[in-house]
């Protein structure tokens, strides 16, 4: 049994990805999912599709409907779909409900934009953010992924928003800078260039 989501109009690939991540969070799948861009679905745009991987298992896929398919069905705008394999997801879900109070201290957000070799997956970048982000790392979100004429051949542009927060104090610039230095250093070691 599959659960299928669709959107068109104002949404984009990242909007659909956000919907999937929110769905997983609501059913107690709290580990970070990763995305493999080699979903191989012919009805999806070849450069805008990915398998959804959770806890090492492919649990679905998402992407932009191929323009030719959209034209065939009279869809005059970009359309996006996510298909989730419910038997796999039900095995992984905990359906737990936890109350979290309102955060007492403010968050600090840093955005990073990178030029990344095409063979490096966003999941590898996210592993670095998680490992090097330190105790104050609260969350991160991919907000831009671009391959095109303005980016040199063999590379893609990737951008993340990274959020830091302490539970017991207001973070100082030095706290955030130290974490960002570790993240950026590890990314540069992978051959990733930071965009200014």
Question: Over which residues does each language-model region extend?
Answer:
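A carboxyl-terminal module marker
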Residues: 1-4, 10-196
